[in-house]
């Protein structure tokens, strides 16, 4: 058993670590609130873009937009979002396991795949794997928002160009979904082709509108060109929304990880104090025994 001085030193060391984890918990909680605000702010833009695409598509019902329709899947693309920093529990590794499960299914079905990674954790993880073709990388830095947006936009454009050129037939976005402060779960959503734009009822209504005539926008350019640009903006907004939601998940996971670390530090301190008291008790008992032995000898 360690002596009393060593135990006191350990207690002080754990207390210092506890102060750090407690401070990191508070910082993560503050950043999480800001990230949730940003996440919620981007949603109205995505919903508005969705509505406009519906209206424009209804006006050009016969135009076979490549971003809207399914085709035979021979190769797929993944945009994988992760964090740049650690200390956020199993947030990243759970997401990577989810993506690898999908990739394994593709390999079994003889479907090829390309990967675009956002965040250093995803870049480091997938770079170590064999047979994973990383075609683009980007990082999101909250201190350099404009530079990050340009870098992410460039990475997304690489995947969009591959889809337009027919090099990939489906594009997925892998990120974490913010369920609550204590719960985040991996999510894989289809970016291209744009799915669930119309329900069956909406498709029927749009066909009736197209035959009867209805209101429409005034286009400065060709309607097909406008629709293509809208689809690209919509995809970019979806990616940005997923990145901001993943950032909120990161801060929530880090806050909980630091809270657990702080609580564990309290448990360790209690155990060390108990060990210290046992050592002190043994020392006192030994001293009393020596005094009694000395008195008996006299």
From Swiss-Prot:
Pfam families: ATP-synt
SUPFAM superfamilies linked to this entry: ATP synthase (F1-ATPase), gamma subunit
InterPro entries per UniProt: ATP_synth_F1_ATPase_gsu, ATP_synth_F1_gsu, ATP_synth_F1_gsu_CS
Membrane topology qualifier: Peripheral membrane protein
Source species, domain of life: Bacteria
Disulfide-linked positions: none
GO terms of biological process kind: proton motive force-driven plasma membrane ATP synthesis
Localization: Cell inner membrane
Keywords: ATP synthesis, Cell inner membrane, Cell membrane, CF(1), Hydrogen ion transport, Ion transport, Membrane, Transport
GO CC annotation, single: proton-transporting ATP synthase complex
Coarse class of the protein's main subcellular location: membrane
One of the record's GO molecular function terms: ATP binding
Function description: Produces ATP from ADP in the presence of a proton gradient across the membrane. The gamma chain is believed to be important in regulating ATPase activity and the flow of protons through the CF(0) complex.
HAMAP family: ATP_synth_gamma_bact (MF_00815)
Record note on quaternary structure: F-type ATPases have 2 components, CF(1) - the catalytic core - and CF(0) - the membrane proton channel. CF(1) has five subunits: alpha(3), beta(3), gamma(1), delta(1), epsilon(1). CF(0) has three main subunits: a, b and c.
Family according to the record: Belongs to the ATPase gamma chain family.
Protein name, per record: ATP synthase gamma chain
């Amino acid at each position: 058993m360690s002596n009393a001085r060593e135990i006191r030193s350990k207690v002080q060391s754990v207390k210092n670590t506890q102060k750090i984890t407690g401070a990191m918990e508070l910082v993560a909680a503050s950043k999480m609130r800001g990230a949730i605000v940003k996440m919620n702010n981007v949603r109205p833009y995505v919903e508005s873009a969705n509505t406009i695409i519906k209206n424009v598509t209804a006006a050009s019902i016969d135009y076979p937009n490549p971003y809207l329709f399914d085709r035979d899947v021979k190769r797929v693309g993944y945009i994988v979002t992760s964090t740049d920093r650690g200390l956020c529990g199993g947030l990243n590794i759970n997401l990577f396991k989810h993506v690898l499960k999908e990739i394994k299914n593709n390999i079994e079905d003889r479907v090829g795949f390309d990967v675009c990674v956002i965040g250093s954790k995803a870049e480091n993880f997938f770079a170590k794997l064999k047979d994973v073709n990383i075609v683009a990388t980007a990082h999101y830095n909250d201190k350099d928002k404009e530079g990050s947006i340009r870098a992410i936009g460039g990475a997304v454009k690489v995947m969009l160009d591959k889809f337009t050129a027919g090099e990939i037939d489906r594009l997925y976005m892998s990120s974490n979904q913010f369920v609550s402060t204590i719960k985040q779960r991996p999510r894989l959503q289809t970016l291209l082709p744009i799915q669930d734009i119309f329900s069956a009822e909406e498709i029927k209504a749009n066909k009736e509108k197209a035959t009867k005539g209805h209101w429409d926008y005034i286009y400065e350019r060709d309607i097909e060109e406008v629709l293509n640009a809208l689809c690209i903006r919509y995809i970019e907004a979806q990616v940005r929304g997923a990145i901001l939601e993943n950032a909120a998940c990161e801060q929530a996971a880090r806050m909980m990880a630091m809270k657990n670390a702080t609580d564990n530090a309290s448990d360790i301190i209690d155990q060390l104090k108990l060990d210290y008291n046992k050592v002190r008790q043994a020392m006192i008992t030994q001293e009393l025994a020596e005094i009694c032995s000395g008195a008996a000898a006299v």
